[in-house]
Amino acid sequence: MKKLHKFFALLTSALLTNAHASEYYSFVASSEFMAPKILQSFDLELDFLGEQDEQRAAIESSAQYFLKRFENSYTFIPIIRNMIAQEGLPQEFLFVAMVESEFIINAQSSKRASGIWQFMPNTAKSLGLEINDYIDERKDLIKSTRAALGYLKFLYEQTGQQWYLAVMAYNCGYGRLLKAIEQADGDTSLNTLLDEEKQYLPPETRNYIRKIVAMSLVFNDADFLKNNNLEYLLNRGATDTLATLKLKSGVPLGLVANSIGLSLNELKKYNMHFKYAFLPPGPADKEYNVYIPYEKLSLFRQNFDTNYKPNSAFILHKVQKGETLTSISRQYKTTINELKRVNGLKNSFLSINQKLVIPILKT
């Protein structure tokens, strides 16, 4: 139950920034005030409330499911909240990420969308996110959130400054939204665009906006919170929980982990954008963002050698037919054990086109 309290306290506090606890409680408790305020955040009319009954019921019945899915997200949510506030977007847009990925940093869809904001590769690259053999910044919490919020602001301007249109364009694409509006004879009202018979928009998009608004309403509904013994909520401050390090290419993540007393696997949870346990190779002056728990920052400053220079570089080798770890180790003048260690291999079996990281000693 403590986790449930913590989870809902965090989610409901997402609609406030820098609020005192007493102000927060009265704000949430006034359900008559909350619903219009939330709808206004999406530029929606009050009559849209009638659309939400089914979605709200489904979400309310799945409270435990959401708890289990998001209990590892406490580190990320305050960061997203802060960034939303800094960009001047409605705080309800936290729930866009919830619907997109359930706050799973490495979420991957069957259509190749990835990350907490579920960017497709081409969209991500157009927004300045780097994707290559070594890194996928769609899984970088900070950079992907900045890109998503910037993209939503762009869509807001393109759609005539209507947030509900921007949200739907984020899901189905701006071009697809324009086509729907054209088919509706230029009518941009939500009731028209969500028409179940005319089906101007794909079913996924019609449900998408409903889910986001419903979640905003549910997790700020005083009766729902009271019925779940969650009426006493502590407003968790919108403080950053991760510190950003600027480290140069080639640095092993294991060194960073050791300097702050974390396991490599624990550090990777905050840095899923790196595909391997080292920073991508590249120019000596290129830097990458590495994230650590904020409370570990002083340890890092004490223990990490900022003048560290890797004594080896890394390249990728694609396994060809007939190759073995023995032949590859000989080709690159390394050892089988080193190849296993760097690539996390538990045995010597390889598959064609498998990518292996090869450490190359610098001369």
Model-predicted segments: where are they?
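Primarily a LysM-type cell-wall glycan-binding module
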Residues: Y232-L264, K309-K333, K346, S351-K355
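An acidic, Gly/Ser/Thr/Pro-rich helix-cap/linker signature
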Residues: H20-G88, F93
